[in-house]
Amino acid sequence: MTQAISDIKAYMQQVGKHARDASRQLAAANTGDKNAALLIIYEQLKQAKDEILAANKIDMDKGRSNNLDAALLDRLALNESRFEAMLQGLKDVAALPDPIGEVTDMTYRPSGIQLGKMRVPLGVVGMIYESRPNVTLEAASLALKSGNAIILRGGSEAYESNQAIAKYILSGLKQAGLPEHGVQVLQTTDRAAVGELITLTEYVDVIVPRGGKGLIARISQDARVPVIKHLDGNCHTFIDSDADPEIAIKVSVNAKTHRYGTCNTMETLLVDQAIANELLPQIAEAIVAADDAMQLRLDAASRTILQDNAKLGGHLSDATDSDWDTEYLAPILAVKIIDGLDAAIDHINTHGSHHTDVIITNNYSKSQRFIREVDSASVMINASSRFADGFEYGLGAEIGISTDKIHARGPVGLNGLTSQKWIVYGHGEVRS
């Protein structure tokens, strides 16, 4: 049950102060203690699997009874495989090199001083997210390993799951001798707590929101604390005239149908007009075969090619202008015939969300132009957009994905939760 808190402002001030105090201790914690805490949490959660999954079932049942959106239900669900992947991510973070204290760019200046840069924690991270109970553990593990304290505010739909996971995070911190307030999962679903968290400039150094476009837009507008974010994931796959047909089909099917409720799912398929007559029907048939619920929203040129295809009956409709700007998070795919590489790049940079975009081609010069000129956090050649993920990038896990250009861009792992400070060694030098 949600804890009733009468004075949200006072509660959040207390949470913030505890986090700031804990952040100073965590910044000085050694790698061994941080890894020990992560592995203790791993073992305890492994033993508590049935308890965690039972808590998630409560959330899922409540979500269904409240008619929660299908994409949110998908994100909310914890099954055996997702639970194991969540735990593996924890072990992967423990195995990563500790970035804190790393010194780079050491150089001597003519004055005699020696200077360089040292990697340090950001301090206190505030995380606001919907569904996805795995984010509770991923964010906590990344914050802990990078020496940050973190305040986690999950959605009300995942309250039982998050609290069950939080219990073992707290236990692991205590057993490892680290501050118990290093990871705090808010014990309220009162939305006023979000408003307080994003304005706690005295205690919080950065906010990371993960959720729907409305949530992130609101936080970006109202926050007084810096925000690391992406608004949505309108990801494209461009099938170039020099594409390998087998790769084009395989990647397109995976990019669209692997999972719908993720920000790295393909939402628009662009096909070069030079190969559209031959290849588009094969791709469309394969995507529809992978999911009979698929709806293809077509521009005029692609409709001309596909409208008489018996295998696609009932799956076709006309695209509107808004389709090119839409993240569906559903079995819906916008399809457009495009006049070559220049038009593809222009379409993506105009309508995309600067998240992840893909070219399928065997032409090296075209691929290099695409990755240089497409203005996205991740740009891929001959691979599914579903790879745009901290785990797949070798980050162990990710606290989020940023489409901003300042501080962090793309999947945000350990280094994204750090900054660098200048360090100077002297021998009594003075400025003349």
UniProtKB/Swiss-Prot annotation:
Protein name: Gamma-glutamyl phosphate reductase
Disulfide bond sites: none
Function: Catalyzes the NADPH-dependent reduction of L-glutamate 5-phosphate into L-glutamate 5-semialdehyde and phosphate. The product spontaneously undergoes cyclization to form 1-pyrroline-5-carboxylate.
Assigned keywords, A-Z: Amino-acid biosynthesis, Cytoplasm, NADP, Oxidoreductase, Proline biosynthesis
Keyword Cell cycle: no
GO molecular function: glutamate-5-semialdehyde dehydrogenase activity; NADP binding
Species assigned in the record: Psychrobacter sp. (strain PRwf-1)
Reactions mediated catalytically: L-glutamate 5-semialdehyde + phosphate + NADP(+) = L-glutamyl 5-phosphate + NADPH + H(+)
PANTHER family found in the cross-reference section: DELTA-1-PYRROLINE-5-CARBOXYLATE SYNTHASE, GLUTAMATE SEMIALDEHYDE DEHYDROGENASE
Gene Ontology CC entries for this record: cytoplasm
Protein family: Belongs to the gamma-glutamyl phosphate reductase family.
